[in-house]
């Protein structure tokens, strides 16, 4: 296993399979968070297509990466809960 330099840029890519057009709905719902990040320590791209949502995160350090991953996964979970309660 390759060691990660905790001080240099670190990356994560999360792919989530979603039914129907839910990936597009999710992309639109996350757009405000992507466009106006709460921290300058991470950059995020969210792409939807073919029933998948892909979240790509680049962060300045491991702590910032962890925080961004946790935030986006929480937002995805919240959106899924809301969509589930509407259906």
Question: Model-flagged regions — what are they?
Answer:
Residues 1-87:
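N-terminal intrinsically disordered, cationic/polar leader segments
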């Amino acid at each position: 296993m390759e060691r990660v330099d905790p001080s240099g840029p670190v990356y994560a890519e999360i792919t989530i399979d979603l039914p129907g057009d839910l990936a597009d709905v999710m992309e639109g719902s996350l757009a405000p968070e992507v466009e106006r990040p709460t921290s300058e320590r991470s950059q995020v791209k969210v792409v939807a297509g073919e029933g998948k949502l892909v979240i790509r995160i680049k962060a300045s350090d491991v702590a910032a990466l962890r925080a961004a991953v946790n935030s986006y996964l929480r937002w995805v979970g919240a959106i899924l809960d809301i969509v589930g309660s509407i259906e």
